Amino acid sequence: MKAEIPITWAEVVDSTNSWASREMSVIDKMSVFAALYQTAGRGQRGNKWHSATGENLTFSIALRFGNSLTGNVRAMDQFVLTEVAALSVADFLSDKGADVRIKWPNDIYVRDRKICGMLIENSLRGDEVATSIVGIGINLNQRDFPAELANPTSLAIATGKEIGPKEALEDFLPFFLMRLEMSLTTEGRAEMRNDYLDILYRKDKPFPYRDNVTGEEFTGTIKGISDIGELLAEMPDKSIKSFSFKEIGYII
């Protein structure tokens, strides 16, 4: 897919997702908003996203659906946007030499350490996704992290290679556009699901988890994901249980 995607860079913003949200009304198909530093970067579950100034890649992709570039996404199929985002980052990092896995739903890990986090915010119109803001933070060159971050890593730590944020974004976007194009067809979506499962973190091996609904800890085995993107885990009694976002915690 060849497309000219508008990219706007800022030295400092509150958060790229908030910035993209403020600009959404004038976005036709797709635009990218990137910053060298965020004063209030946001992650999943309301967590703050930490990134040293200029050392990492923090950006948001704003998408409007119902056109030739983005296609149409039913609300019940919106997990495909998670697959597009996670796989495109995995493609980019793999191309740079990192051995990555996707920690459900969309964190990217190198071994047991987090190299990328995402915050995807969708708005619906009826039973269709109207817009999506895909916020992505990739640790590129940072080597020293705050002590409160439990398990961070970066491309520099994982591979010994450094790359500037602007160059990294230019290198990343073709992977995103390729995965977005795959999402336009049934065959492409099926291929993406297989690609996602192929690099799903901890798949088919027993590990400790926490049921965040009951508070109980258990040893389970991730078997895959459901049609709507729930995590499927084999429980100690060999039954298969589905978990929605925030319902399961990884004990690492």
Predicted regions and their residues:
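N-terminal lobe of the biotin/lipoate ligase/transferase fold
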Residues: 1-94, 116
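Long, positively charged amphipathic alpha-helical accessory segments at protein N-termini or as interdomain linkers
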Residues: 2, 66-100, 110-252
